[in-house]
Amino acid sequence: MKTYSAKPAEVQRDWYLVDATDKTLGRLASEVAHRLRGKHKPVFTPHVDAGDYIVVINADKIRLTGRKERDKQYFWHTGFPGGIKSRSVAEVRERHPERLIESAVRGMMPKNRLGRAMLKKLKVYAGNEHRHHAQQPQPLEL
C-alpha cells in the first residue's frame, strides 16, 4: 500500500463564506489559515495547494482582546534612511479594516511561493457585500 500524494489537477476546491462579526482576530485567522492550506482535508499534501477559497465579510467588526486596539502597532519600512513607519490597530481599522485579517492570516501561512499562492484564495471585505455570488460560497461557522 502506498502513501497517497495529491496532485494539483485532482484537488477539489470549495468556496466558503465567513462572517467576522464579533469574532476574535487570532482565532478566526488561525482557522482561515488552516482551511486555506487544506489541512482539514484527508488529501492534504504539504507541497500541493489543496486549500479552499475563503471569503470573509464584515472585517470592520472583528474583535480584539485586551488593549490591542490602542497598544498593538503595525510596522513597515519605506526603504529610505530613518523610514520606519507605524500605525496602531485603531488607525489601520479606520483606513483599511480588511488588512487586519489579511495580515494575521499572512503571518500564519508558509513563508514561500506556495504560501503566497494560497493567500490569493483569501478574499476579505470590510462590509456585508462581496463580489463572489457566482461561486455560491457556503456559509462556514467558525
Curated annotation (Swiss-Prot):
Species of origin: Halorhodospira halophila (strain DSM 244 / SL1) (Ectothiorhodospira halophila (strain DSM 244 / SL1))
Function: This protein is one of the early assembly proteins of the 50S ribosomal subunit, although it is not seen to bind rRNA by itself. It is important during the early stages of 50S assembly.
HAMAP family: Ribosomal_uL13 (MF_01366)
Any single Pfam family the record assigns to this protein: Ribosomal_L13
Top-level taxon of origin: Bacteria
Assembly mode: Part of the 50S ribosomal subunit.
GO molecular function terms noted in the UniProt entry: mRNA binding; structural constituent of ribosome
GO biological process, one term: translation
GO cellular component: cytosolic large ribosomal subunit
Entries under CDD domains matching the protein: Ribosomal_L13
InterPro entries from the UniProt entry: Ribosomal_uL13, Ribosomal_uL13_bac-type, Ribosomal_uL13_sf
Family: Belongs to the universal ribosomal protein uL13 family.
Keyword hit for Ribosomal protein: yes
Protein name per the record: Large ribosomal subunit protein uL13
Keywords: Ribonucleoprotein, Ribosomal protein
